[in-house]
Amino acid sequence: MRYQYTKPFGEAYLVRFTETLLYRYVEHFTETSQLDFERKMTTFTLIRWSNYVTYAEGTAGITWNTGVSLLTQLARKSAISYDTSMWGVNRPAWTIDNYRVGIKYRRNFYRTWLFFELEPEVTWPKDASGRRNSTYAFMATLEVQFGK
């Protein structure tokens, strides 16, 4: 179940609150609260600060995530985002488990409901000794949208 409330402030600012409740057989009950702040920089560019907290049944505490993205529409059917984020947990203490930077290229192709994304990223997770090592990843996503 999902609830979303969006509040624009003038032409350039927007605040969005999203609450998501899930029940899955393995993870059981999960609740995520998200708060986004957006500022339109130009007609085709905006900056977004996203914040999440998630509680999952059977875990001690919450996981959290905060990040900033710069999103730009390149053409009518393509866009790119530059992202940075960090996330962690609040138990036994508030800690940062991982840092991330990435770029996502998104393009609509062939049909209005078909998209692909290419996303390289670098993360710096904390290992058991507390050290951070670079981890590189590349994701390719195919998205099919149903409905309007």
Q: Where on the chain are the PLM-derived regions?
A:
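Outer-membrane beta-barrel channels and translocator barrels
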Residues: T6-A12, E38-F44, L71-A79, Y110-T112, ...
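Aromatic-anchored, glycine/proline-accented short structural segments
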Residues: T20-W64, V68-L70
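Membrane-embedded beta-strand positions of outer-membrane beta-barrel proteins
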Residues: V15-E19, S33, T45-N51, T66, ...
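Residues that define the transmembrane beta-barrel architecture of outer-membrane proteins
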Residues: M1, E27-S33, A60-T66, M86, ...
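Residues on the lipid-exposed face of transmembrane beta-strands in outer-membrane beta-barrel proteins
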Residues: Y3-K7, L21, S33-R39, T66-T72, ...
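Structured C-terminal portions of repeat-based eukaryotic scaffold domains
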Residues: W64-V89, W94, Y99-I103, R107-F109
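Outer-membrane beta-barrel "beta-signal"
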Residues: F109, N133-K148
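Sequence/structural signature of outer-membrane beta-barrel proteins
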Residues: Q4-G10, T18-H28, Y52-A60, K77, ...
